[in-house]
């Protein structure tokens, strides 16, 4: 099948970064870091702790601790080779950790069972539950590890040790023959430089030659004493900061207008205002195509946010645009089709800059044309909330991406200008720099499950809003006579020029679409149509590929085609929705489809229009995606029966006889979810006419039903009037 230009745009091969290609061509630097993962490769532990606290320093610089391991069996023979530590992240609730022994209690066989008991709970052994013995239940007054065991003459005993660390466990040592020592110790604090793992120990034989150790939760293993690593893991970085206090006495209102100088035509006015800034950060998660495990990107959007506040008794309507610069890029995932992966996700990290472009409806922005002595005193932001996003993969638990806090410090203020679809507005740009963050991490499921990746910085936000206050002052040159108005005070319409260009081009485009040769259109539709083809067709546009791609993508994201193509479960939709959604389903590899015809018309026509700007090209791409060939039909084939859906009706027919049959709506829905969906380029009426007029065979009918491109092209080349008439009918629908 031809590589549809629209399909490339839907699958996000081209995307915009930063501030969606700013009009002022500001720097949008992206820093890509290659990080030495160290022992996270083995331990997969986050260097952070959830919450608004310091960033924890990692000490896993050697591969001593490995895991987390998910296998449910540790063979007894592996315990006899050398000393080994079994380590656990402290569970959230009371849970069984491991057991060695038969399936049910047997007084003739030694056994032991390890539990984690959360403070304030009672723990009752599963293995020894059938015994009438008080030792089978232990009350945990603090977080504890509890070992239940029987061996030799001991019918049942238990050992409890404190588990105050975030991560800890026990030592298992080989002794004589086929026996091991289970060693336990109270894990209270990290005050000493060494740790005695053998405060208590007991020697155990193997229960039976066929019995190993059953593991009930994820665990880590260490072949050398892990105390140093566990100690360092819990010690946060310490930042020394200086605090100062001062008393400020204000003798007048901060919100004032002061005339600095004045003559007959002009006056200089100093404006001083209190100001409230709000920061809203929001991520955009873009899902790729394929099996449903592939996510293209997780990026921070440029956010437009409005809010109100009171300034000196006046209600102020404020508008801000929040964007970022100098972000880090990360990726995650495997290579197989069913491996969950993220192609790229942005991370706000140290030295990332946040830009807040601010304007409000007060008089100061109407008079902000010629300005000097601009200064601002703005507080910083600590943007904090516990935010998570869970990726909806088809099978298994949904992996989660988690972030919590990031601190922004104010650096400087500049004059700026914002362009919207309606007006151009003067504004102020407040620049903030990131100085610290709580870090991010990913989990295999909910937030309490295994960590699969982590790092410093801030990786996801759900639209939470934070606030800071400050004041601004500047001197503006304005007319002495208030009846004079500057152009910016009455605003200027930006979009009017684009609409005029589109109107001028519409008639030319539609005439050209009529005049393009039918064979040329179909030949182009069956060739690989890429974004490069589109750029080659409009050489008059003097912009970089990146700028053009970003602007086209920005416009295309608002089309109905783009929004409909993300739906995956077609069985949940009515027929009308299905017709707009099936374009994202795999088709026959040799088949022609409607999207390839529409993009071929567009590419073959735009090279004759002498386009000179990116906005006009983007508008044509978006309008052609939504408006070309509005009357589309789709079909599925199974066991010689064709199921067809058009905008007005649904029907089915026998492929051999072309006799209509009863339409099975349930089967149609199942096929639409699982089977290749074919664009009905040659409709049913044309198929019947071909059979009755030319007596074509079943094999040719099948190829026409399947929209086989070589077959359709051969009929076009031979000037078949029925096929030509059908294709021309489709092309006549291609109107801007």
Curated annotation (Swiss-Prot):
Which residues make up the annotated site Cleavage? 231-232, 247-248
Q: Which Gene Ontology cellular-component terms appear in the entry? A: host cell endoplasmic reticulum-Golgi intermediate compartment; host cell plasma membrane; host cell rough endoplasmic reticulum; membrane; viral outer capsid
Give the record's GO biological process terms: permeabilization of host organelle membrane involved in viral entry into host cell; virion attachment to host cell
Please tell me the species this chain comes from: Rotavirus C (strain RVC/Pig/United States/Cowden/1980)
Coiled-coil stretches, from where to where?
Answer: 495-515
> What UniProt keywords are attached to this protein's entry?
Capsid protein, Coiled coil, Hemagglutinin, Host cell membrane, Host endoplasmic reticulum, Host membrane, Host-virus interaction, Membrane, Outer capsid protein, Viral attachment to host cell, Viral penetration into host cytoplasm, Viral penetration via permeabilization of host membrane, Virion, Virus entry into host cell
Q: Which residues form the signal peptide?
A: none
Identification of the protein by name: Outer capsid protein VP4
Q: Which HAMAP family match?
A: Rota_VP4
């Amino acid at each position: 099948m031809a590589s549809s230009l629209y399909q490339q745009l839907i699958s996000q091969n081209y995307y915009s970064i930063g501030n969606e290609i700013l009009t002022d061509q500001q720097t949008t630097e992206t820093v890509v870091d290659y990080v030495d993962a160290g022992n996270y490769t083995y331990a997969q532990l986050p260097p952070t702790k959830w919450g608004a606290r310091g960033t924890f320093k990692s000490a896993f610089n050697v591969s001593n601790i490995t895991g987390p391991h998910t296998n449910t069996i540790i063979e007894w023979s592996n315990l006899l080779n050398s000393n080994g530590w079994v380590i656990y992240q402290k569970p959230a609730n009371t849970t069984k950790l491991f057991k060695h022994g038969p399936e049910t209690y047997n007084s003739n066989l030694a056994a032991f069972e390890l539990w984690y008991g959360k403070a304030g709970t009672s723990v009752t052994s599963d293995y020894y539950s059938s015994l009438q013995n008080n030792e089978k239940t232990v009350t945990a007054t603090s977080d504890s590890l509890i070992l239940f065991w029987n061996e030799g003459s001991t019918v049942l005993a238990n050992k409890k040790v404190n588990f105050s660390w975030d991560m800890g466990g026990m030592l298992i040592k080989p002794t004589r023959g086929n026996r091991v020592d289970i060693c336990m110790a109270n894990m209270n604090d990290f005050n000493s430089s060494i740790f005695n793992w053998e405060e208590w120990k007991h020697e155990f034989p193997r229960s039976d030659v066929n019995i190993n150790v059953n593991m009930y939760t994820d665990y880590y293993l260490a072949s050398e004493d892990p105390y140093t690593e566990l100690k360092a893991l819990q010690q946060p970085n310490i930042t020394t900061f200086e605090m100062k206090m001062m008393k400020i006495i204000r003798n007048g209102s901060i919100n004032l207008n002061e005339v600095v100088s004045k003559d007959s035509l002009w006056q200089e006015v100093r404006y001083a205002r209190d100001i409230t800034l709000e920061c809203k950060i929001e991520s955009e998660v873009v899902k790729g195509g394929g099996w449903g495990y592939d996510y293209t990107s997780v990026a921070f959007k440029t956010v437009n946010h409005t809010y109100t506040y009171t300034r000196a008794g006046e209600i102020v309507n404020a508008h801000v645009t929040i964007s970022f610069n100098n972000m880090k890029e990360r990726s995650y995932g495997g290579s197989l089709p069913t491996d969950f992966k993220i192609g790229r996700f942005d991370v706000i990290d140290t030295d990332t800059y946040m830009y807040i472009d601010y304007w409000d409806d007060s008089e100061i922005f109407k008079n902000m044309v010629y300005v000097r002595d601009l200064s601002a005193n703005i507080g910083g932001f600590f943007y904090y909330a516990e935010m998570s996003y869970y990726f909806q993969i088809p099978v298994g638990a949904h992996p989660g991406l988690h972030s919590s806090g990031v601190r922004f410090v104010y650096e400087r203020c500049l004059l700026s200008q914002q362009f919207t679809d309606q007006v151009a507005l003067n504004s102020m740009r407040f620049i903030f720099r990131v100085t610290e963050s709580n870090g991010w991490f990913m989990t295999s499921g909910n937030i309490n499950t295994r960590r699969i990746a982590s790092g410093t910085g801030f990786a996801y936000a759900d639209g939470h809003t934070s606030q800071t206050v400050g004041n601004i002052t500047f001197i503006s040159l304005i007319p002495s006579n208030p009846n004079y108005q500057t152009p910016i005070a009455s605003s200027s319409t930006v979009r009017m020029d684009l609409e005029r260009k589109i109107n001028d081009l519409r008639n030319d485009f539609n005439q050209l679409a009529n005049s393009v040769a039918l064979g040329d259109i179909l030949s182009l539709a069956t060739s690989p149509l890429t974004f490069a083809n589109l750029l080659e067709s409009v050489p008059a546009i003097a912009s970089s590929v990146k700028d053009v791609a970003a602007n086209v993508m920005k416009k295309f994201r608002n089309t109905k085609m783009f929004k409909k193509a993300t739906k995956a479960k077609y069985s949940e939709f009515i027929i009308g929705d299905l017709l707009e959604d099936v374009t994202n389903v795999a088709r026959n590899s040799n088949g022609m489809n409607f999207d390839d015809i529409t993009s071929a018309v567009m590419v073959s026509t735009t090279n004759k229009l002498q386009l000179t700007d990116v906005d006009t090209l983007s508008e044509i791409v978006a309008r052609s995606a939504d408006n070309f060939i509005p009357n589309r039909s789709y079909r599925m084939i199974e066991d010689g029966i064709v199921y067809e859906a058009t905008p007005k009706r649904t029907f089915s027919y026998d492929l051999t006889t072309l006799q209509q049959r009863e339409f099975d709506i349930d089967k149609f829905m199942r096929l639409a979810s699982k089977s290749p969906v074919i664009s009905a380029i040659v409709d049913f009426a044309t198929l019947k006419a071909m059979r009755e007029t030319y007596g074509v065979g079943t094999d040719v009918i099948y190829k026409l039903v399947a929209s086989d491109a070589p077959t359709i092209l051969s009929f076009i080349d031979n000037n078949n009037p029925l096929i030509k008439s059908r294709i021309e009918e489709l092309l006549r629908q291609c109107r801007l």
